Design a protein with these regions (language model features):
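Conserved micro-motifs of the catalytic ATP-binding
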Residues: 40, 74-79, 118-121
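Short alpha-helical segment of the dimerization/phosphotransfer core of two-component systems
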Residues: 51-59
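Conserved catalytic submotifs in the C-terminal HATPase_c
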Residues: 80-84, 107-117
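Short helix-loop "hinge" at the ATP-lid/N-box region of the Bergerat-fold HATPase_c
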Residues: 137-138
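Short beta-strand/loop element within the Bergerat-fold HATPase_c
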Residues: 144-156
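Short conserved segment of the HATPase_c
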Residues: 169-182
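Conserved glycine-rich
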Residues: 208-209
Length: 230
């Protein structure tokens, strides 16, 4: 009975949150289209079009995340497991995020063992996992701090960890934070769908891995493990 009530509560919250995330950019689009239909200067037109473009991209990103969440949670995504270099996976992703990390005033600190580590994963899905975790850090980590990224050998697995100081107080448990559309900022003022962690967890599990979140005060940590190979 308790589980069913929780499930119903989550469904209600999901509908409420996705409605909010769709309504906000849609309202903005409608308002700015109305402004464009009135008399305006060329400078105002450029400003209005920039807002429309930004809000349209928000809706597109939300739609893409919703589709990916649905596919990931049902396992309806092709998964091609192969031997991958952990160093290459992390270095490539951090390199591609250099500008965003700089803009968020986050200093990435990567710790890897001297010896080469290899894991069994799907390269494209692993990119999406790392992409979601770095994107999450850029949105919610405290500016002017470090983002600690590490990987190490742990038995028959490679254990990955991402640690950062949260910008907002984390008055929420790890399980609740993992739920769909839940964000670290309860005001929902930060851009993003709130689906990133849920998608990352589903994609890791699709690759026969495990995924967890730990919160200690303002310290936020994501850990996941994938099968190791030589």
């Amino acid at each position: 009975m308790e589980q069913r009530l929780k499930s119903e509560r989550l469904k209600t919250e999901l509908i409420t949150n996705v409605s909010h995330d769709i309504k906000t950019p849609l309202t903005s689009i409608v308002n700015y289209v109305d402004l464009l239909q009135r008399e305006h200067t060329p400078e105002q037109e450029r400003e209005y079009l920039a807002v429309l473009d930004r809000q349209a991209h928000k809706l597109k990103k939300l739609t893409v995340d919703l589709v990916e969440m649905s596919k990931a949670s049902t396992g309806n995504i092709p998964c091609h497991i192969a031997r991958r270099s952990v160093r290459e996976l992390i270095d490539q992703t951090v390199g591609e995020y250099a500008e965003k990390l700089s803009a968020a005033r986050l200093e990435p600190v990567v710790t890897l063992p001297d010896e080469e580590l290899y894991c069994l994963c799907d390269g494209a899905l692993m990119w999406r996992v790392l992409d979601n975790l770095l994107s999450n850090a850029c949105k919610y980590a405290c500016a002017g701090t470090r983002l600690y990224i590490a990987a190490r050998r742990e038995g028959e697995t490679v254990a990955f960890s991402f640690k950062n100081i949260s910008r907002d107080a984390l008055n929420i448990g790890p399980d609740e934070l993992m739920e769909r559309f839940v964000r670290g900022d309860s005001s929902r003022t930060t851009e993003g769908s709130g689906l990133g962690l849920n998608i990352a967890k589903s994609l890791v599990e699709l690759q026969k891995g495990t995924f967890s979140i730990a919160i200690d005060g303002d310290l936020f940590k994501v850990g996941f493990a994938l099968p190791r190979t030589e």
